[in-house]
């Protein structure tokens, strides 16, 4: 039992009872009984043992003991940790001896924390040791010179030399105040924990301890002040971590939950009976009062509010223009002025400046200062709003789609080529040129391997092949447009080869050979050139017969041009064809040559270089007029051969023209006055010569250079196409009418992709079937493709 309980038991008033023989008197008190009554082990006893112990203590107490205990103070009673006192019979309280424990294993907590002294009256006085608080104690150490005046302002002690009292009642003298020099030194050499405040209880400078500084640092850094506290301890689910199966939570379902309730059935039957009798109505119409209440609740304050119309003379204020790149705090470098521009802006008058500020690069937004002209700009804005007159401009509400031309659907414009039907393989290297014969049966190709090959168009079977260039590629091949004789012209190196393939029927082959042989007689009757003219470079070349090997393979004539020809174009009658040598080393007078098949004659129509636009690139005859179109790098010129005059100069605006073609229909239907131009700068241009010298339409659908453009040769299908280095062909619908009030209609139809890009080159050339809506393309991948 605790000491407090012992004291209560000793001071309790007990009734006098007679001593029995088995009860000990107070003088015969045993030490073991007292030890059991005062030690802490009594807490482990049961309630029955405590009751018996109280009875023993009451029996052991005597009248003399009660008187002595009444004289004891509460602070003289031993604490729970004190050892029991031994009392002998006939001894007083002064004779009590403090028992000592000789056992070395006893701890310091079991030693008594008091000593017994005599007071002034001679009574025993218990003097306790000072409490040494630990970390778990509510007590704290008191400083020796701590001021104990409490919550009293120090101004009460202004007239006294002291400022309070310590715990022993001694005066605490006022601390000495430093002079100005000391204050200056203190401000320079700031000690650790310095706050600049004065402690109201001591009058000394208030300094914080290391623990207080650490606490302030943690609070400032938003850290947890308490040491060792972990805010992210693992969650301990006290109520759900262990599933306890017991009748409270996992009891079996009662039977009443599966059996219909009889009481509910009775109540439902009462309601059904009342509904049948009419005492309960399933739907009760709301009363008028409730409807009025609902109307009042749902009243809309602005239900009848009408929008206030603007004044007839009201004109809204114009909005400020949105800021541009030059107003950014980190503008692009091209918007930043250099030193010259900055100096010119600073020297100019404010009225003459283009803008009120100079673009400045601050690097980051936090470095941007305040705008100095902010107030001035707002003031001028206010002046403009109420002083400047306003003008209302009517805005036209135009549908953007109405501005676009209404193009028909591609499905309505069929037929046009859309799929690859045949692939022609056999050339080694790039296929530079191809051509479909006027009958539409054969396809002629020429490539880097120096061979000219003739294929069957529908099947892709090779029928004829001849090698005309040992090291030079075949740059261009073209069929004679007439059907009475079949002649194939091929340019390889510096020569032009006229070939009659041995794949024709005998009659057609003989007619073709007779056409070429007729020219030999005219050339023989022509006077021979003089010796002085033979050395000139401008002397037209003489047609020669081929070698025996070439003659056996169908080559009938050779024209030595002395320069590489890149373009061949036949006249519609089949008796003339023009060649162009665009090389930079070619003389201007020999770049363009016109050849007569029936006379074996070559002429140079231009004695001087064409002005402007660079060397010539390609040339074509007009389909119905005696006009020759010659294209150089930048312009297309039309020459009247009968009058020998320059008719027109067409300016496509391209950097480098690669090819062009003339509309095949007659001039009476305005077809011959339209042409298309392809350029190496990825543009396809449509020209209406009656409209302007400039392009009517510019189409930019390719990512790389355009190599060839071509109209469909018959007027039956209004189709044209272009071939590009991006490996694709673009098919267009271009209808031309004779109405002078209507323009040409151009509709993109299909993008054909199949050739592989080899060496940055894609599709090199293309041609149309003379009767069908088919086209054939030659690629740098060594193949040709028929598109249907």
Curated annotation (Swiss-Prot):
Q: Where is the composition biased (Basic residues)?
A: 1-12
Composition bias type Basic and acidic residues, residue spans = 115-125, 337-354
| Repeat (WD) residue spans along the chain | 426-465, 469-509, 611-649, 652-697, 701-742, 758-788
Q: Where is the composition biased (Acidic residues)?
A: 41-79, 100-111
Could you tell me which InterPro entries the record lists for this protein? Answer: BOP1/Erb1, BOP1_N_dom, WD40/YVTN_repeat-like_dom_sf, WD40_repeat_CS, WD40_repeat_dom_sf, WD40_rpt
PROSITE patterns, per this entry? WD_REPEATS_1, WD_REPEATS_2, WD_REPEATS_REGION
Entry's Gene Ontology BP terms:
maturation of 5.8S rRNA from tricistronic rRNA transcript (SSU-rRNA, 5.8S rRNA, LSU-rRNA); maturation of LSU-rRNA from tricistronic rRNA transcript (SSU-rRNA, 5.8S rRNA, LSU-rRNA)
From the Swiss-Prot or TrEMBL record, what is one GO molecular function term? large ribosomal subunit rRNA binding
From the UniProt entry, list the residue stretches annotated as the region Disordered: 1-125, 308-354
Kindly state which keywords UniProt assigns to this record, in alphabetical order.
Answer: Nucleus, Repeat, Ribosome biogenesis, rRNA processing, WD repeat
Q: Where is composition skewed (Pro residues) in this entry? A: 318-335
Per UniProt, subcellular location reads as: Nucleus, Nucleolus; Nucleus, Nucleoplasm
Pfam families, per this entry?
A: BOP1NT (PF08145), WD40 (PF00400)
Q: Which domain of life is it from?
A: Eukaryota
Give the protein's biological function.
Answer: Component of the NOP7 complex, which is required for maturation of the 25S and 5.8S ribosomal RNAs and formation of the 60S ribosome.
Quaternary data: Component of the NOP7 complex, composed of erb1, nop7 and ytm1. The complex is held together by erb1, which interacts with nop7 via its N-terminal domain and with ytm1 via a high-affinity interaction between the seven-bladed beta-propeller domains of the 2 proteins. The NOP7 complex associates with the 66S pre-ribosome.
What the record says about family reads:
Belongs to the WD repeat BOP1/ERB1 family.
What is the protein named?
A: Ribosome biogenesis protein erb1
